[in-house]
Swiss-Prot record:
GO terms for cellular component: membrane. Belongs to the cytochrome P450 family. Disruption phenotype: Impairs the production of acetylaranotin and accumulates chemically stable intermediates or shunt products such as cyclo-L-Phe-L-Phe, prearanotin A, 2-hydroxy-2'-ene-cyclo-L-Phe-L-Phe, 2-methoxy-2'-ene-cyclo-L-Phe-L-Phe, emethacin A and 2-imino-10'-hydroxy-cyclo-L-Phe-L-Phe. Glycans are attached at residue 289. This is Cytochrome P450 monooxygenase ataF. Cytochrome P450 monooxygenase; part of the gene cluster that mediates the biosynthesis of acetylaranotin, a member of the epipolythiodioxopiperazine (ETP) class of toxins characterized by a disulfide-bridged cyclic dipeptide. The first step of acetylaranotin biosynthesis is performed by the NRPS ataP which produces diketopiperazine cyclo-L-Phe-L-Phe via the condensation of 2 phenylalanines (L-Phe). The ataC domain of ataTC then catalyzes the formation of bishydroxylation of cyclo-L-Phe-L-Phe. It is a single-pass membrane protein. The chain crosses the membrane at residues 12-32. Its main location: membrane. Heme binds at residue 434. GO terms for molecular function: heme binding; iron ion binding; monooxygenase activity; oxidoreductase activity, acting on paired donors, with incorporation or reduction of molecular oxygen.
Length: 489
């Protein structure tokens, strides 16, 4: 045996010993943590196969009490509806959404959950106040984005909505975030779509590994290496945009507003790394959820075609041939209702309002239970969306359910898609309700309006509505199912 092979064997034995020690230590910590959670005076449900069925069974037994849900790589307390008012205004030192996002979405690689007051302020104030501004960029981009994915087929042509809507969401959001020409650059578009996919794929792997071992395993995952490369690429591509000379004439072309708002939030101007961080945070928040929601909307139009003509009629009566703008978008009540109903039955998650308890004394609930510090919590959304006391015949898709409710005196401004409350937490609720929900809702309306006015849509023959897929608590559309589109005559 050669000296080199002996050295390699010794090195392997040394590394194996370290890995074994770390694994034993990590497993021990994981078991101690699990035992502490099991000692809570809460009913515990373990997900073996069907997470949806498990949540429904747990809710049926404990409709007004919290319960522990145990899944691969995660245990959390699922709160009842009363938990919404308990946590909706609590600050980060009581329950933390940032810590949750950092843990779940691999913050050390994705920036999710990292401290970024400039990003928070731009999203919560600039974006919310200036939704009409980004609306103009959506309108300017929608035809290019839709035709780039679907073309203008004069015969019925099959498309996979999830793949197409990912690109449409990237183009539309990119136009608002960074503007032309970068937003249409193929490398940039592909990277933004891949970024959201890699975050999800990396988590699906890492969730099966004890948390103490994840820093040692993560750097070797191809998805994590890809995330690092995308961070570097984003910095490189955004650096030229920090040069004031490149801002000339940008005001004449809709788009790039988010980038400007990010820059204005830094007194000394952002570094390329800071700007890349803000851009990637906005990218993940928008593209992942938007592409899923747009896919569901296309499936629902194809599955429930009786809604298509009433929606087209509303668009024709309200728009009168003009593009969507800040005035007429408020009058599209049936379109808004259709989008909210689609989200009610196809929400982003089975539970929402994610937090980690950070108060050392724990979180006291109306039920008398105390959730300990360090415990992950969420509020059940699935059972809220299907509550027959809120929504008659809740499993039935009624695209105009909410527009009819708004016709009742006193309800004019209620039941809108972007409205949150104790009856709708699909965008969260309270202090940390999704700050981009009006941005997202406007983008969905612009895309849906363009599709309805320019395309016919249907399901392939003998195909039922595509089923949702569950990954943990996340709900995603079927990536393989097709819809048929053709350009209207």
């Amino acid at each position: 045996m050669s000296l080199a092979s002996l050295d390699l064997n010794a090195l392997w034995l040394e590394h194996s010993a370290v890995i074994a020690t770390l694994f034993a230590f990590g497993t021990a910590l994981f078991l101690v943590s699990r035992s502490q959670k099991q000692s809570l005076n809460l009913p515990r449900f373990e997900v073996t196969n069907d997470v949806l069925k498990t949540i429904e069974e747990a809710h049926a037994q404990y409709p007004d009490d919290p319960f522990i849900l145990s899944m691969v790589g995660m245990e959390l307390a699922i709160l009842p509806r009363s938990g919404i008012d308990v946590i909706k205004t609590l600050p980060e030192d009581q329950v933390s959404i940032k810590r949750h996002h950092h843990d779940v979405f691999l913050g050390e690689y994705t920036y999710m959950g990292t401290k970024s007051p400039e990003f928070d302020e731009a999203m919560r104030y600039d974006l919310t106040r200036n939704t009409p501004t980004v609306l103009a960029s959506f309108v300017a981009e929608v035809q290019y984005a839709v035709e780039d994915s679907f073309g203008r087929p004069d015969q019925w042509t099959a498309f996979q909505p999830r793949a197409c809507m990912s690109k449409i969401a990237s183009l539309m959001s990119g136009r608002a975030f960074v503007g032309l020409p970068l937003s249409r650059d193929n490398t940039w578009v592909d990277a933004t779509v891949r970024y959201t996919q890699d975050v999800t794929r990396a988590w699906l792997v890492l969730r099966t590994i004890p948390w103490v071992l994840r820093p040692f395993v993560a750097p070797f995952l191809p998805q994590v290496r890809s995330l690092k490369n995308q961070r570097r690429m984003t910095e490189e591509r955004l650096t030229p945009l920090l040069d004031p000379s490149n801002a000339k004439n940008r005001d004449e072309i809709p788009g790039g507003d988010m980038l400007r708002w990010f820059r204005q939030r830094y007194p000394q101007g952002p570094t390329p790394k800071q700007l890349a961080r803000d851009q990637l945070l906005a990218t993940f928040a928008s593209i992942y959820n938007l592409s899923n929601a747009l896919s569901y909307l296309l499936f629902d139009l194809a599955t429930y075609p009786e809604h298509i003509e009433p929606l087209r009629q509303e668009l024709q009566e309200v728009l009168k041939g003009e593009p969507v703008n800040k005035e007429n978008i408020q009058k599209l009540k049936k379109l808004d209702s259709f989008i909210r109903e689609s989200q009610r039955l196809s929400p982003p998650s089975l539970a929402n309002m994610p937090r980690i308890v950070t108060n050392p004394r724990g979180l006291k609930l109306p039920s008398g239970h105390t959730i300990p510090c360090g415990m992950r919590i969420m509020v059940r959304a699935h059972t809220l969306n299907l509550d027959p006391n809120l929504w008659p015949n809740p499993t039935r898709f009624d695209g105009f359910r909410f527009s009819k409710l708004r016709e009742i005196p006193g309800n004019t401004f209620k039941y809108q898609h972007a409205t949150t409350g104790t009856d709708n937490i699909n965008f969260g609720h309270g202090l940390w309700a999704c700050p981009g929900r009006h941005f997202a809702s406007s983008q969905m309306k612009v895309v849906l309006a363009h599709l309805l006015l320019n395309y016919d849509i249907k399901l392939p023959n003998r195909m039922e509505k595509p089923q949702q897929q569950h990954f943990g608590l996340a709900i995603v559309p079927d990536t393989e199912q097709m819809v048929l589109l053709k350009i209207r005559g």
